[in-house]
Amino acid sequence: MELKKMNGIAVLLTAALLCSCSTKSDKPKITQNSPVPQNVLTASQDSKQTQQTVKNEEYTPLNYDEQKAVWISYIDLAGMLDDSESAFRENISKAFENVSDLGCNTVYVHVRAFGDAYYVSQYFAPSKYIPAEDGTLRYDPLKIMTDEAHKYGLSFHAWLNPLRCDTQVYMEKMQGTQIYEWYSQPGKYPEYVSKPDNSDYYWLNPAYPEVRKLIADGAAELAENYDIDGVHIDDYFYPTTEKSFDMQAFTAAQTADDLSQWRMDNCSEMVHDIYEAVKSVDKRLLFGVSPQGNMDNNYTQMYADVKKWCSEEGYLDYIAPQIYFGYENSVCPFSETLKNWENIVICKNVKLVCGLGVYKLEREDEFINDMGIIARQIGDTEADENCSGFALYSYQSLFTKTDERFLEERKEISAQLK
């Protein structure tokens, strides 16, 4: 995502997050004994689902026919995390209350952004943003987040960046993990972890089955150990179009003769493996991908074969393209772009969720000049029978802006939802 490429500013958001929350509502939290909210997909609604082997038998996933989602990024979380478990619980609970009060029912929350973990993991090192001592977490943020989200009736999708790792400084702190072994022994594991030219960040290479297995195992670990409702990845597939990034791996793949197709096949294998890993734990859990809204970019820059994933079984439950464009955009006008995505979602088991860019309200003229444009776009998705919801990027843009313009925009969004 465009805005998610920001780094290093996360710790500055704490004060903004704590002071910008909406007025506390009198709406009661949902408890274990509360009735299931309307339009919820549960096991009882699908006799096939009730016959599945479920490894996390104590939890029934909470998902909605129509997703009304908000992305909560690692940048947002860094401003909420605290040395105190109780303080973090209060901060994240307030965030979920804000999302619920707005009229939304789902959150995509970052739990792995840089080859790290916001939870207890046997595969990944703790995130640099999490309070820890000698690599041991002081508390488990993900356990707290799922508990608090469900109190407000929010479906919780664990958001991963499966391939992106970190800078050299933080890669050196991942000792004891598989990623560190690959990173520290490039002679033994050539290009398992690669760094594009003119970039400080390392990336996992999906060309290798061992890499794809690690990513899939990490998704299964989340599904089995935590009360999540889905797994979600975004548009960070290949970080570069440079041939040098993975030339050794490509050369070794003797059956491949087209670099672009080979890379797309690698990503498709990875997406399929994550899907299968999640479903192996509980077929009621959802798996979704949020690719770039510009269809061509997925093929020419990211090597993401979105048409394949939306037309064949075994890849997705939903796709949430980032249609962060205005109605008058010269390259990807909103209505036309949404229609293009509708046309490729032909697999009956894949739903379309429209990603909307709230952050554009302070970045582009059409969004700045057209008051209520996000609310209007939400209305368009709700009126479109081919859409199964929307997702708003991001929490920061929705709730940490205190100027009159953003307050009015949020008011119009809430009015549209309610």
Residue positions per predicted region:
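Active-site-adjacent "subsite" loops/lids of carbohydrate-active enzymes
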Residues: 60-89, 157-158, 163-221, 225
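Substrate-binding cleft of secreted/luminal carbohydrate-active enzymes
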Residues: 313-333, 340-418
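Catalytic domains of carbohydrate-active enzymes, especially glycoside hydrolases
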Residues: 90-117, 225-230, 314-318, 387
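Aromatic- and acidic-residue-enriched carbohydrate-binding clefts of CAZyme catalytic domains
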Residues: 65, 115-142, 169-205, 239-261
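Aromatic-lined substrate-binding rim segments of carbohydrate-active enzymes
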Residues: 113-161, 255-281, 334
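C-terminal motif of bacterial Sec signal peptides marking the signal peptidase cleavage site
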Residues: 18-20
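The substrate-binding groove and active-site-proximal loops of carbohydrate-active enzymes
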Residues: 75-86, 124-138, 198-213, 256-266, ...
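Polysaccharide-binding and catalytic clefts of secreted carbohydrate-active enzymes
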Residues: 98, 185-312, 324-325
